[in-house]
Regions:
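HKD-type phospholipase D/PLD-like phosphodiesterase module
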Residues: 1-19, 31-133
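Glycine-rich anion-binding loop/nest that anchors nucleotide
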Residues: 28
């Protein structure tokens, strides 16, 4: 399966998150979408391991756009901030159960969902998944 999505991306990601049984690994430059964080918190309560790394910048930390990741951590999520340096985290991918990769231009933000033209590709090609691990 190699499928590209240009519309209704958040719901496609939510569908993939809901299918996770063991582990979700996410590297995301910007993450401000509460629905996606809620889905990750739900998976943590089902004992799915969730690892999340995001960029340590103003968008992810401010009171207007930023999310409260304390609940994620309290539910057992592994949370990491990537510092801004000469080479900063600009990835946008998620690996589900080491079997499915979701990648593309879509940050997990409200802007990506409601204001930008974005895309993702969902693939179960194991060679591609391994490249991202």
């Amino acid at each position: 399966m190699n499928i590209a999505f240009f519309n209704d991306i958040r719901n496609e990601i939510l569908n993939q998150i809901s299918s996770a049984k063991e582990e979700i690994n996410i590297a995301m430059a910007w993450f401000t979408n509460q629905d996606l964080l809620d889905a990750l918190n739900s998976k943590l309560k089902e004992n799915v391991m969730v690892n999340l790394i995001i960029l340590d910048d103003e968008i992810n930390r401010n009171d207007i756009y930023g999310l409260d990741f304390v609940s994620f951590i309290n539910n057992g999520g592994n949370f990491y901030l990537s510092s801004i340096s000469d080479k900063f985290l600009h990835h946008k991918f998620c690996i589900i159960d080491s079997k499915i990769i979701i990648t593309g231009s879509y940050n997990w933000t409200n802007y990506a969902e409601y204001r930008n033209d974005e895309n993702i590709i969902i693939s179960d090609d194991q060679y591609v998944v391994l490249l991202y691990k």
